[in-house]
């Protein structure tokens, strides 16, 4: 699995403020890990977020092209056969310490959040 790492931090894609989480609404957690760590998709989301004031927004066709190119998929109209991508429109990137344990959880309203604080006995 490829990851975007800068300054010993790993970029993780998730979808806060969304009724259908990018990670939590996909049943195949192993397959979705390729997506939430994919450097090219994360770079695209970071670029869109940086330029939102200029009217940039997530383009599903661009996302599909990224997935096709880098995950060697051949996705067309049947994107839901591979990933449930409703959460991609509100996707954000969180930088976590490399090797740190984390979990993506979801609120009752479907908003994802990243848990990094774990209790240890």
What is each of the regions a protein language model found here?
Residues 2-121:
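Catalytic phosphate/metal-binding cores of nucleic-acid and nucleotide-processing enzymes, i.e., regions
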């Amino acid at each position: 699995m490829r990851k975007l790492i800068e300054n010993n931090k790993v970029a993780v894609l998730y979808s806060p403020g969304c009724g259908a989480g990018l990670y939590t609404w996909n049943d195949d957690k192993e397959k979705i890990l390729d997506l939430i760590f994919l450097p090219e998709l994360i770079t695209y989301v970071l670029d869109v977020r940086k330029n939102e004031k200029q009217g940039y927004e997530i383009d599903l066709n661009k996302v599909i092209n990224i997935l096709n190119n880098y995950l060697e998929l051949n996705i067309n109209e049947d994107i839901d056969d591979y990933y449930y991508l409703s959460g991609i429109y509100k996707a954000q990137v969180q930088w976590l310490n490399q090797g740190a344990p984390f979990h993506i959880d979801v609120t009752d309203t479907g908003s994802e959040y990243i848990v990094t604080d774990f209790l240890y006995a």
